[in-house]
Amino acid sequence: MKVKPVILCGGAGTRLWPNQKKHQAKQFIDFGGWTLIDQTLERIKKPIFDYPIISTNFKYLKKIKRHLKKNKFKKYRIILEPSKKNTAPAILTAALAADWEDELENHKFEQPLLFLSADHFMQKEHIFYKAISKNINNLDDENIFIFGIKPTSPSSEYGYFLTKKIKNNINKVQKFIEKPN
């Protein structure tokens, strides 16, 4: 079973200030010819992934299309957010679109979705792929998997989830704390 990657690329991505231009989101900043959106697109070229859904806004549409072409994606789906409403509505819209598409193709909803931020940098991608491969077999209709990292210090720029260990490296989320606005 292939995983449907959903790339969330609608945010302003401003946490690199003062190292970024005023009107350039973090995911589009060039780091030696390689942007964070390029790294994200490259990350989902493995055989375990289906073609991507990209959730973005009209402001980034041309840039997204350029990066998809640069990374040789022939099949993809772009969902335009009508206005900036944070992460949850973007996830919901993309999930509904993916389920609708899955139902049209397969007459049932069963393809797992993997939501990825367009502006993440990963140094140890093999751990990411291992976690997906390991957990894809544990999915069921009642649960979702959230991949996270242990914070090294408190920050008001990120949300947190509190967990309870169930087995091995699998924890149950007990509470999610959204970042303050």
Predicted feature descriptions by range:
Residues 8-11, 157:
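Short glycine/serine/threonine-biased micro-segments
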Residues 28, 78-79, 144-146:
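Conserved beta-strand scaffold positions in the cores of enzyme catalytic domains, especially
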Residues 8-9, 55, 114-117, 146-150, ...:
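Short beta-strand segments
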Residues 122-181:
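Conserved core of the sugar-phosphate nucleotidyltransferase
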Residues 1-7, 14-18, 22, 34-115, ...:
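Conserved N-terminal catalytic core of the sugar/cofactor nucleotidyltransferase
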